[in-house]
Amino acid sequence: MDLSVIKAASLDLESLPSQPTVSSFQQLRETFIQSKSEDWYLKNGLFFRYYSFLKSSLENATLDGPSQVACLDTISVWLRRIFNACKQDPEISKYVWDTMELKFWTNLFSLPANKISIPGLTGVQVAVKDVFSKSLQLYLLVCPSEDIKNDFLLDSLKHALHWDRHAKVVCTAIQLLVKVTGAEAVFAFQPDFFEQSLKLLKDYSYAQAISSTILTVLTLRFKSLSEETEDREEVETKWMNIWCPIILYEFYGNDRQVQAGMSSFLIPSLLGVSPGITVKFLSRLQNYPNVSKDARDAACLYALKIAKDSKIIKNLDLVKEHAFVKTLFKHPDIKIQLACFRLIALCPNVSSPLSFEDFDCLESNIEFSFNVLDPDSRQILLKSMQDFFIRLRASCHSIARTMRSRHSDKVALSGLLDRAMQFLTSFISVCKKHLYPTCNYQQVLVSLSFLDTLISFGLDDNVESSSIREAQHDFPFSMVIIDRDLSRLMIDRLKDPYDDIRNLCLKILLSYKSLPGFISDSDAYFLFNHGLELLNAVRSHECDGGAKTIYLCNHFMEKSVPGSVLANTKVILNRLKSNIEHAKTSLLEAAVNCPLQGYLIQLTYIFQSLSPTIVKNDNESWKNIVMELIKASETIWGLIKDVLCDDSPEGNLPDGEGEGGIVSNLEDTPAQLILSYSWRSLKETSSLLTVLLTKCLSLFDEEFTPFTLNYYGELMMTWLWEIRHRGAFTSVYPCFIEYCSFLFECNKHEISELPDPWLHKNLSVIQEKSSFITRRSGGIPLSITAILVAGKDKREQLIEQTVISLISIAKQPVEQKNIAGQFDLPQVHAMNTLKTIFTEHRLSSVSVEYLEPAIALSIEGFSHELWPIRNCSVMLFTALINRAFGSKKPKDAVNLGNNKGLSTKMFFSKFPTLHDYLLRELEVSVASLSSNDQPSTGLYPILNMFSRLQYAQPYGNENEWTGLSQFEPLIFKCTASRICKVREIASLSLTCLLDCSKMTTFIVSQLKGVAGLQQNEIHGKLLTIRAVLSCFFSKLTLQQVQEFYEVVPLAFINCFLEFTSSKTSFYAKKLFLEVLNSYFMSNTDSNAKRLQQLRRMTMDYCKRMLLDRKANVTNVFNTIGLPIHQQMAATIFLENLKEFSVYCDAHSIGFLVSKLLHYEFYEVQLTTLRSIVDSPRKKIIVNNPEILQALIKLTPRNQWSQVRALALSLLSDSLNSTSYRLLGISCSDMVSNILSNECLPIKESFIVLLGSCIKQLKTENFLEYKVTFAKWVEILLSYSNEYQPFSSRKAALDSIIHFDLFNAESTAEAFSFEFYILYLLLGDFLNDDDEEIRSLAANHAYQVLGTSAQCVTEIWNLWKLRTKATFGGQHDFQHCINKRLILEDGCELASVQLDNALSRNCSLFERERQNLYYSDNQKLEDLLFYASYPNEKLKDWATDGINAILSRFEDVSRDGPLGKTSDPNVWFTIYKIIRIAEHVHLPLDRVHSLMNRIDGHPSFCQ
């Protein structure tokens, strides 16, 4: 800025505008900065001259947001210059005090409360903090009287303590004030300051600021206590009594968010205040009463972590003092296990060495890390392991450096280094074990992630330097991480079904200088040939595995034999051409035997990584390959075009493809095979073509002329225009974006301009083509959007012309054509394209500028006469709303006091033209609604928009925004509409017009004058009250809640009779009861007399309506809505029955509940049943004789299935000898029902009930018990299968739990037959795929075992021991184990199982295991734990298996990586044969010799 301008402005106050702007404030701020010091010493200087202006500006509520921030920045500089002047001249200090009014000081000190945030601006709190701190400095300097100073600052502190501390500037203000006033003032003004502050830690984003505030107050209090007495022990005890009880209560509470805030920020600082605090805190933590040992240990674990992170505790004593930490590795909560690992493995001082006990503990418990199922916990684990390796490296380096010292204990230090190496070796072997085939996803992923992290630390000399992370020091030793066996396992995993596992394996292998264990050329060519075989696979993950294998081979082969990549590419190209020729003859045969996708994927990999150096060595050959591939892309398109462009591509079978012998041998339908072949081929073709066009322009520019590039761009657009299969054209979309981006960024003008005319061509296609009429316009919107996304530099220009053109097309009148009764609807395509543009997140910053005309277009489309346009208008409106409002969270989702929605003022300031448009449309719609009760369909989107807005809260001295004053009466009219849906959405819309603080007054006003209103008006008022309460009640302050319960209950009491009269509809009554139940019936405050009166009146009404038949009208017309009204009445009655039982006359609770179970409406019956199910006293309630009788009457077939299913499941909790006879259903009848064609919920309820009945039958009729038990076991086996749905498996588990293994275990006769099956089934449930089932099974298992709660893995280990000890010697048990071991898919012979595994399955999809938690090899090892020795059955089976292995692989010359023995099915079959053979002590020398000869899987070689 020109200095002369500044000086001129500083001399002329009149030059400042009456309504200052950002520029005027910036100019004035520069004036203050550039001014001389003497200008501030004069009484008529810069201070006095601008005081009035700045004072009025601070109070000006009409300033926009940027101007307010600029004003604060200017005042900050002004205050600093005044402060400096006052320090130099006391006279100026006195003058400032006399001039600045108390109101101005008050405004300055109130800024943190009034200017917490300004919508749309950042940095507001920083500016406010700066002004507040400078204001406090100046006030302390200029105030002449200590009394005045203390009174003002204490009053400021008192107000500040009531401000919203969800703002960091408020926390800072309190800290600054407390440092002046002292901590005693805080506790005087707010005795529960610490308790209130602790609750605010729930929001982690503010936890640090709030913790700093708490710490400031408590530290000052500690200093004041220290001044009172010199006894440090007494000071620490008194000080801890202030905060420790509340901290301990939260430590053992259930609020994880508060605990996280305390642990991260508050407690470490508190423990560091004085040396003795930590010991006292841990002592109080360990002696906290009324908590379990597990909870106490877990809390101590967190405390130890805090102390260790704070460097208060340096080393853990895992042998004595902290031995409990080792047991917590078996805790049920995975977060506790992770905390144990982090506590031992990590240390703030990374060079601190681990002890032998630390290594032993980690090594013995490291298995826990491979069973982490939760993705978030897994990320924490991986980061923790990385930090652990950093510490291990630093500590080993430190040890090695110390060993060079002359006085060091070299023997002890050398032992620590050796132990570190032993740990790493053991760790790698554990990772290796979890890479074997059939290991579950999380085990493989964690293992690979660990290894990927470990190799980046430079331990292995064979790792490329580019793959090693930079560090100041290295490990003092080296070791081989990936050996031949691990390398083989990773290569095998290249065809894993999961993308992330395949990619991670390839990344690890490529990080090595040479492929570990495969260094010869023959190894590379062998791998290459295996990769070629996989390229011809049907399944996509196998194709990709083959492509990755060849990519891996190319990477290493090119290093040793230059030109290998070219030679390999030619081989792949020839195979691709051969398969294309097969497709010309028969698409079906090509889909089965000669797919294209694998070769296309591989070629894409080759050209993505192709370096110019390789091309230069044989330029002409590479050019020929590129041109052949580009032509091949057109050939492929010609082959698959008819399939993908068919009106019904999913069921299209080209002529002649359904004939021939190949069809009879297919496992998939021909149409499915051809379609999959076609769209996958196109997907990979588009990807390859894009890579070729973008990569090779710089290599062969003479071949890729603008004409050629334009031709293939139009070809891609043709794919998007004509293809009907959504999977196909959506796969082209990202490729077309990449291609257009490349063209736009090209430095050649004639190429960079190519996409522009494509955009116009797309717009022409919308109007010209009528063959694309689909509900979402196929790929046309993607074709246009791709160009807009790609044109980064031209994006604003392109979007402007595109959106304007599309809106113009969408507004064109529809012309009907009588050709085959179809419509040519470019309007539909235009609106669908707009929807795609506004949905695309990469265009959000630009597209939002055109939201206003698009919203208007979509609203008008709601009223269109044609359904296709109305339909796409709805979809467009949804996309626009999501773009305007961002998050899809419900409106009432509040984040701890932060209003993060879009206010009405902000919305209409962003989209100003919508104000008049929406008002005009709303007036028309309401007028139509009033005249003929037929709303314009545009009314719904308008009200929907308002329902998503929030009230425009004024900031500071701003006046309330009145921009919606014209909308308010219109929306209120809608709440009284005769159309229910209009009333509902209008009531939600009203919430944006109401200030939360005025909610109580508003509700009272709504409840006045209810008498005489029509039913629709009453219903509308109740809907409005419900919407307002739902939106605002959770945001009320404690004082506002108290006011609410003092005022509103009386208003409800006054109109209670009107709402519940016979004239009021049951819909309105139900809504009335719903409001009472949600906001009044749960409040049991006995001091609120009016509230309790309202609750009693509600309870009496519900009882009268439910139990007094005369209270219900008999006129059929007046009973509309009665069932749902009675359902809500039943909900209230049942939830409060125990509390109000004194008002239930002489009737018992059992009688009242049984009456509801017999009610005429099934809604009431369902509500009653669900209330019993959810009750913690369920068993007591069900065993009430009257309730039991009622439940039994709900079990016959003529009852509604949902009612019947719930009743049956409840009866399982009630059975005793009396109730069993009353039930009237025998166990055989239950079995018949389960085996019948009853609906699944009924069957599952009978299964649960059957477990209880058999338990009772055991004591009454043992013969029948034995027969029924066997049938029950068969049912459990069929319903516990992993392929059964969750509800069926849970029903089977519940049946076992109701049978009660704990009590049944003591019955001797139970062990005389198949009782062991229940133990085996419970073991299966302990390893179920669903965590809820595992937890339920673990709860029952540790009750039977008599142990404390532990992790499921540990419970399972104990359960295995108990099962074997109890049943291991029984013949039937061993027979069952043998059957489980050797039976596979109904086949018993090992040789047949091996043949089945070896046979190639050409189906598109394999049958996937549903249990991804419990792997096959884990299950095998557990079954072998039970199996006896000697065991002739297993011996015969294993012998057959060994002979099968020897014969099937006798002629194999080499199996190797990706070979047959690496196939998961083949591997597991062979592994099972070998493990069972080892169990029965059969010799395996021939098998091991064979596997060594053919290079079989490492687990089979010795």
Swiss-Prot record:
InterPro entries: ARM-type_fold, THADA-like_TPR, THADA-like_TPR_C, THADA/TRM732_DUF2428, tRNA_methyltransferase_THADA. GO terms for cellular component: cytosol; nucleus. It is found in: Cytoplasm; Nucleus. The keyword Nucleus applies. It holds the Pfam family DUF2428. GO terms for biological process: tRNA methylation; tRNA nucleoside ribose methylation. One of its GO terms (molecular function) is enzyme regulator activity. Disruption phenotype: Loss of methylation of the 2'-O-ribose of cytidine at position 32 of tRNA(Phe). Increases occurrence of 1-methylguanosine residue at position 37 in the tRNA anticodon loop of tRNA(Phe) and decreases occurrence of wybutosine at this position. The keyword Cytoplasm applies. Its main location: cytoplasm. Keywords: Cytoplasm, Nucleus, tRNA processing. It comes from the Eukaryota. Belongs to the THADA family. Together with methyltransferase trm7, methylates the 2'-O-ribose of nucleotides at position 32 of the anticodon loop of substrate tRNAs. This is tRNA (32-2'-O)-methyltransferase regulator trm732. The lineage of its organism: Eukaryota, Fungi, Dikarya, Ascomycota, Taphrinomycotina. The gene is trm732.
